[in-house]
C-alpha cells in the first residue's frame, strides 16, 4: 500500500510532500558541499587537492542548491500543496504528469552525482562555458553526464510549468477572476511562464555543447566558424530568468506571511504586487547580457543592459514597500515566520543594492568574477530564497502535518541562522572589493582574515541546519496538535483543518463574489 501511495501518487498533497522531503535531502547535500568549499578557503594553502576537485565541488554545490533544493521546495513542494487549496481545485490539472515531474528529479540527481564520480568530474562552474567544457579541457563523460542531468531536470520543470499554468488558469471556480486569487498563486503562475519560455533555450545551448563534444560540430568552436560567446548568450537567456524563478515564489510566500502576522485581511497594494511580479517576469528576459559585460560588447549595448537592469529595481521596490506598508499599523504577532519574513525583506534589499552596483557595466568590469558577485547572489539566494523557504515552512508546517513546531526553538534557530549567513557572506563583499577572484581554491595571504571569518560563519550555519533537524524531530515526537487558525476567510488553504483531508474540493466550491 505504502509503495503504491508514494511511487504512483496522483495526489497533489503527497507529491508536494515528496518534493519537500527530496528538497530537504538535496539541501543537506548542497550544504555539505558548501562546507567543503569554506573548509578549503578557511586558510591559505591546499586542503582538498587541486583546483579541479575544488571546482567540481563548486559546480555541484550550485546545481544541487538551484535545481534540487530551491526549485523542488518552492515550486514543487509549496506550489503543489498550496495552489489547489488556494484556488479551490480538487487537484492539479494533470495529476499523473505531476508525478512524473517529481520522479524525473531523483534520476537527474543521480546523473549529476555520477558526473563527479567518473573521470575528473565537471569542474566548469555551473555556467559550463566552452572551451573549458569542451572535449579537450574536459575529456571523459563528466560534462556529458551533467548535461543529461540538466536535460532531465529541465523536462521536469517544463512539465511542472505546463501543469501549474493549466491548473491556475483553468481550475478556478467560475465566479473567481484571476485578480481575486492569492498572491502566491500569481507568483507561481509568473514563475511557470518564465520556466516555459526560458528552459528550451538552455536545452538548445547544452545540446549544442553535447554535439560539439561528441559529434564534431563547431557551434562554439571558432576553428569551425562557431563562437563561444553564442553559448554565453543562450545560457544567460535561460539563467537570468532562472534567478527570478528562484525568488518569485518566495515573494508570494513572503506576501502571505507578512499579511497573516500583521493581522491584515490582505497585503497592501494587491494589484501593484501582481503587476510588479509580471513586470519582473518580463524584464527578467531582456537583461541577460549584464552577466557578460566583460566579453567585449559595444558601449551602446552595455548602456542598454545597464539601464534595463536598473529598471528591475522599480517593481522590486514596489514589492518591498508594499510589504512594509502591510506591516504598518498592523496588530503584529511576533512569531517565527514573521522573523524570517522581516529578515528576508532586509537582507534581500541589501542583496538588491549590491545588484544595482553590479548593474553598472563600468563597475562590473572590475568586480566581475570576484567575491563581490558571490556575496551579491548569496544575499538574494542564501538569505532571500532560503529565508522565504524557512518562513513558509514554519508557517505552513501545521497545515501539512497537523502539528506545531516549538515556538522558542524555532526563534533560536532563526537567530543562529541569521548570524551564520551574515557572518559567512558579508565579509565576501570586502574580499571582492579587494579583488579576490571566484572559483580559485587558494589565495594570497592578504585575504586570510575575511576568508577565515566567512568560514566560521559557515560553521554557524551548519549548527542551524542541525538544529532544524532536531526541531523537526521534536515536533513529530511531541505531537502538539493545532488548536485553532485565525483569519481563515482570507487564508482559504486553512479552511479544511490541519492537516486537510486526503481529497479536498471533491465537489466544486461555491463562491459568492460581492459586487464592489
UniProtKB/Swiss-Prot annotation:
O2 binds at residue 244. Mg(2+) binds at residues 368-369. It is a multi-pass membrane protein. Na(+) binds at residues 40, 45, 441. Binds 2 heme A groups non-covalently per subunit. Binds a copper B center. It comes from the Eukaryota. InterPro entries: Cyt_c_oxase-like_su1_dom, Cyt_c_oxase-like_su1_sf, Cyt_C_Oxase_1, Cyt_c_Oxase_su1_BS, Cyt_c_oxase_su1_dom. Its cofactor is heme; Cu cation. Keywords: Calcium, Copper, Electron transport, Heme, Iron, Magnesium, Membrane, Metal-binding, Mitochondrion, Mitochondrion inner membrane, Respiratory chain, Sodium, Translocase, Transmembrane, Transmembrane helix, Transport. Its main location: mitochondrion. Its EC number is 7.1.1.9. Residues 41-50, 118-140, 213-227, 287-298, 358-370, 434-446 are mitochondrial intermembrane. Pathway: Energy metabolism; oxidative phosphorylation. PROSITE patterns: COX1, COX1_CUB. There is a cross-link at residues 240-244 (1'-histidyl-3'-tyrosine (His-Tyr)). It is found in: Mitochondrion inner membrane. GO terms for molecular function: cytochrome-c oxidase activity; heme binding; metal ion binding. Belongs to the heme-copper respiratory oxidase family. Component of the cytochrome c oxidase, the last enzyme in the mitochondrial electron transport chain which drives oxidative phosphorylation. The respiratory chain contains 3 multisubunit complexes succinate dehydrogenase (complex II, CII), ubiquinol-cytochrome c oxidoreductase (cytochrome b-c1 complex, complex III, CIII) and cytochrome c oxidase (complex IV, CIV), that cooperate to transfer electrons derived from NADH and succinate to molecular oxygen, creating an electrochemical gradient over the inner membrane that drives transmembrane transport and the ATP synthase. This is Cytochrome c oxidase subunit 1.
